Regions:
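Single conserved hydrophobic/aromatic residue that forms the stacking wall/gate
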Residues: 1-5, 9
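Hydrophobic (often cysteine-bearing) scaffold residues that line and stabilize catalytic clefts
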Residues: 28, 32, 114, 118, ...
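A glycine-rich, hydrophobic loop/mini-helix early in the fold
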Residues: 29-79
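Short alpha-helical scaffolding segments that buttress acidic/His motifs in well-ordered protein cores
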Residues: 35-40, 97-104, 143, 147
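Short alpha-helix boundary/capping elements
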Residues: 39-45, 105, 126, 130
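Acidic, carboxylate-rich catalytic segments that either coordinate divalent cations
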Residues: 43, 148-167
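Helix-hairpin-helix/helix-loop-helix acidic hairpins
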Residues: 64-108
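Short conserved catalytic/interaction loops centered on acidic-Pro-aromatic/His motifs
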Residues: 108-141
Length: 167
């Protein structure tokens, strides 16, 4: 079995384990980093550790490395202040999740594995608020387009994609 195939297998096994038995946490940045550590510890020595270099992808610049910690504090403090979006009606919930998705996507705190970490964290957060989301029903290409648009300040498509998948 090739190294690349082995890496894919390890990621799938860890994601499956996380789905079966979610990591306990209080939906703070430490919890977010713990999910990354859990998902990628078999692949990267630096799993769960913040990147120290600036990143961009497909024309999108992510949070400067030196700003990750202060930005994360703002994002996760706001999440706590909003009571983790519990008790919100569907439309308001989707609006908040869309905003949270955008801000954590911009944060992009790790060198690799940001998307999988973000989806795993969001799944747990959404479930804790009494909703669910099935990522397998989300068109990956459409999500990527929506994410790129959202990075440019246009969140309509992302809100629609997430809104249709959250129930």
């Amino acid at each position: 079995i090739s190294s690349a195939a082995s890496d894919v297998y390890k990621r799938q096994v860890n994601a499956s384990k996380l789905e079966q038995c979610p990591l306990e946490g209080v939906f703070d940045f430490a919890h977010y980093k713990a999910i990354h550590q859990f998902l990628f510890s078999d692949l990267y020595d630096w799993a769960g550790q913040l990147r120290t270099v600036n990143l961009s992808k497909k024309g999108t610049d992510f949070c400067p490395a030196e700003e990750i910690e202060p930005q994360a504090k703002l994002i996760f403090d706001r999440l706590k202040e909003q009571n983790y979006f519990k008790g919100l009606p569907h439309d308001a919930f989707v609006e908040e999740i869309t905003d949270f998705y955008c801000t954590t996507n911009y944060l992009h705190p790790f060198r690799e594995g940001n998307g999988r970490t973000q989806r795993a964290f969001l799944t747990q957060l959404i479930r804790s608020a009494g909703y669910d989301l099935n990522w397998s029903e989300v068109d990956g290409d459409l999500l990527m387009i929506a994410t790129i648009q959202a990075a440019q300040g246009v969140t309509d498509l992302l809100r629609q994609v997430l809104g249709e998948a959250i129930y």
